[in-house]
Amino acid sequence: MTRKEAEKELIAMLKEAEGGPTYSMEEVDAYMRELLHPKNQIYLTGDTHGQFERIISLCERQQVQPESTFIILGDAGLNYYGDRRDNRGKDKLAKIPITFFCIHGNHEMRPSKELGYQVKEYHGGKVWVQPEYPNLAFAIDGEIYDFFGYSCIVIGGAYSVDKYYRLARGYNWFEDEQPSDEIKEKVERVLSARDWKIDVVLSHTCPLRYEPTEVFLPMIDQSSVDKSTEQWLDTIESRLHYERWYCGHYHTDKEIDKIRFMFQDYALLPHQISLSAESAPSRR
């Protein structure tokens, strides 16, 4: 039973009760429990970079149910090395009986068949999954996922401002860190087919006009930073009718307009709204 279904049943009970039918306390209690403590919560947080202690602690405190999903908005730190060293983090999350849904960041490899991944269906879209870690789902850019009635498009990737620092010291840097032209075309094609209406955007970086300049690193010359992904997201955001936009990347927690930047904070994807083609508001 979803929270939306529980709410619907309770409303129906109240309406019918006006005409005489009665319901047992057990029936009412079951629906109330689902409303107050839903099993299918959708959690969100920002970059973890392989440090999962805070997520594990939250799951234990909240007694997160197996039906729940935990979205990490990029740079989860699970595909950094491309070898067995990545299994340390995967093993930790495998012990938590929920699904972790990871957006692609800029400090990690894109999953592939060469890394032992398989493409599977998940909430109406496609994800990469390793058979050894079935509860770790890696989102594919441009796919739309249905999280309990919410249409969510994923747009991962960003530019690494520490690119040359990494290259100079032999640290990993990934050439395909930003969305390719093919990915951009897919995103635009998918959104166009939906008349540019979506409930939620899940991205790693943000549209250019929303960049949190207050957290820019002072030693980085911003004129040398490739902002092509942010510029492109600007064009997407200006055309898109959406309810919420969640992103990570900047290691800050803040909210402006409908966009929420996430790092160590947590959010729950609401259950009660859905932006249909008929009810979508005009934002521009």
PLM features: residue spans?
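Core catalytic region of metal-dependent phosphoesterases/phosphodiesterases
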Residues: M25-L35, Q41, T45, G50-F147, ...
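Conserved beta-sheet core of the metallophosphoesterase superfamily
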Residues: D91, T99-I103, Q118-H123, W128-V129, ...
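Active-site neighborhood of phospho(di)ester-bond hydrolases with catalytic His/Asp-centered motifs
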Residues: L44-G46, F70-D75, F100-H107, A139-I140, ...
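Beta-strand-turn-beta hairpins that frame and shape the catalytic cleft
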Residues: E34-Y43, I144-V154, V200, I256-R260
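Short linear interaction segments
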Residues: T2-V28
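Active-site-proximal loop/helix segment associated with metal-binding centers of metalloenzymes
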Residues: W128, P134, F148-K227
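Short, solvent-exposed loop/turn segments at secondary-structure junctions
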Residues: H49-G50, G77-N79, H107-M109, G157-V161, ...
